[in-house]
Amino acid sequence: MMYQQGCFAGGTVLRLAKDLAENNKGARVLVVCSEITAVTFRGPSDTHLDSLVGQALFGDGAAAVIIGADPVPEVEKPLFELVSAAQTVLPDSDGAIDGHLREVGLTFHLLKDVPGLISKNIEKSLNEALKPIGISDWNSLFWIAHPGGPAILDQVEAKLALKPEKLEATRQVLSDYGNMSSACVLFILDEVRRKSAEKGLETTGEGLEWGVLFGFGPGLTVETVVLHSVAA
């Protein structure tokens, strides 16, 4: 079990589950992300007005998924393939997101340059993850991006010149449920799968072959998972 990992942990548990499933024949790994972010709600503080941002964005949520290798035909139907996964800590980001356990409980503080730090470094993470499979067109991917908040999504979208529909599922989940920390990326995976089925698209990934899952959180830490969709 993992505790107090923050918003990037949805990617972390997928990476660890992938490793367990690949290295233990016949294994099936149950991944559960459960977040009660309401415990961070506090009254306004003159010294930490930034805490109001997180309190306005966050929400409670839980999601689960099963990870395995070598699916059993006619018994199991995979939804996505986890191709590769990596974690990195962004440079010059120490203290950008802080969490502390105090007498009043768990508190979080966010620096105003968090969206800029993420958007400035995201392309490097993409290149490292996707260069081995020859992808450099970010609009050719389906996107499972941890929402963070609207400012982060806006800056990432602008930095990578993404079409508005690329982050549509992420924005929908943020609007419906708020930032549920680690659980968000699993909600977004399901949203992409559901919309693809509703539209009758050829794959679970909006009709596309390749996708990327991003998780951002304290550190600043980025989890990157390369996804391959399957036939619908």
From Swiss-Prot:
The keyword Nucleus does not apply. Its EC number is 2.3.1.74. GO terms for biological process: flavonoid biosynthetic process; polyketide biosynthetic process. Keywords: Acyltransferase, Flavonoid biosynthesis, Transferase. One of its GO terms (molecular function) is naringenin-chalcone synthase activity. Pathway: Secondary metabolite biosynthesis; flavonoid biosynthesis. Transmembrane segments: none annotated. The active site is at 7. It is an enzyme of class 2 (transferase). Disulfide bonds: none annotated. CDD domains: CHS_like. It catalyses: (E)-4-coumaroyl-CoA + 3 malonyl-CoA + 3 H(+) = 2',4,4',6'-tetrahydroxychalcone + 3 CO2 + 4 CoA. Belongs to the thiolase-like superfamily. Chalcone/stilbene synthases family. The primary product of this enzyme is 4,2',4',6'-tetrahydroxychalcone (also termed naringenin-chalcone or chalcone) which can under specific conditions spontaneously isomerize into naringenin. This is Chalcone synthase. It comes from Malus domestica (Apple). The gene is CHS.
